[in-house]
């Protein structure tokens, strides 16, 4: 057997990540890949850190590489690069297949350097899957057309049958999130106070490493009565699985995890990822600039 038939690389966005959302993504990627009966052995490589000598060797030997679920594409790779590779890595970084990958944020058409790099990196025969229509259009604009919009792998099991079992009526307790890098003190204070008015128990789960510091910038009156959870995926899972627990918050993948666990969910859209998913897949998203509508969404059946 040819060495290149022996294994495939999986770019793992949870390696060296301080965002638990990346673990939610990779959990779904791993689950979906496990359904492929003839998938060879898999080897994980980071997206948040550069490759060493062994990483480059694995890239050169693998049959292909799968990039799972994260929003690491951007229009100007020389200015902003979520995917941490050096230009010299392009000698090895080839035949990558996108698996529910998205665009960093709303941007213009990719520049010439980015077009060259993406055409070099991405497999030109295999079909790529992306998170949303915006990412699809961005790739089409530079001539990469072997792409379909499947949504993020975290959403692939959110079938109509699954979603029918998600409560439509408000629960007794709520788990909420905030986003440290996309702050709006006024809107987020309104979010917290609205939750405190309508729920018996209000739990804050920090998905990112700086979310708790953002929470601590709010006044004592706003923070009073909140229960702070540990920033771990197991803590999130355990609390979302408790009966009559809703999810409301700005963290997209915490919201998708809530839907996976059949919790009533309202995602507050603060960037292109949630907003584009709502357009394409009817995800329950309320734009943050419409936060005054949250109260009605909480009390009325979803």
Predicted regions and their residues:
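Active-site anion-handling motifs in enzyme catalytic cores
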Residues: 1-302
């Amino acid at each position: 057997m040819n060495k290149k038939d022996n294994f495939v690389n999986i770019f793992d966005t949870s390696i060296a990540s301080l965002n638990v959302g990346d673990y939610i993504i990779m959990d779904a990627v791993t689950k979906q890949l496990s359904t492929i009966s003839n998938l060879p052995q898999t080897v994980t490589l980071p997206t948040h850190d550069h490759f060493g000598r062994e990483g480059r060797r694995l890239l050169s030997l693998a049959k292909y590489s799968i990039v799972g679920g994260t929003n690491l594409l951007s229009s100007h790779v020389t200015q902003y690069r979520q995917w941490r590779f050096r230009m010299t890595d392009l000698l090895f970084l080839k035949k990558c297949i996108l698996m529910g990958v998205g665009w960093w944020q709303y941007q213009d058409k990719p520049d010439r350097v980015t077009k060259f790099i993406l055409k070099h990196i991405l497999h030109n025969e295999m079909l790529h899957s992306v998170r949303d229509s915006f990412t699809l259009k961005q790739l089409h604009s530079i001539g990469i057309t072997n792409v379909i919009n499947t949504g993020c792998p975290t959403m692939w099991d959110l079938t109509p049958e699954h979603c029918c079992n998600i409560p439509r009526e408000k629960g007794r307790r709520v788990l909420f999130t905030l986003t440290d890098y996309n702050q709006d003190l006024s809107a987020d204070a309104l979010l917290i106070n609205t939750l405190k008015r309508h729920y018996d128990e209000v739990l804050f789960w920090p998905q990112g490493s700086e979310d708790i510091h953002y929470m601590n910038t709010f006044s004592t009156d706003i923070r009073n009565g909140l229960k702070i959870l540990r920033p771990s995926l197991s803590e999130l899972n355990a609390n979302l699985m408790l009966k009559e627990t809703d999810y409301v918050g700005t963290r997209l993948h915490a919201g998708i995890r809530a839907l996976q666990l059949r919790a009533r969910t309202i995602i507050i859209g603060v960037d292109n990822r949630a907003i584009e998913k709502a357009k394409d897949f009817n995800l329950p998203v309320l734009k943050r600039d419409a936060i005054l509508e949250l109260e009605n969404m909480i009390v009325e059946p979803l």
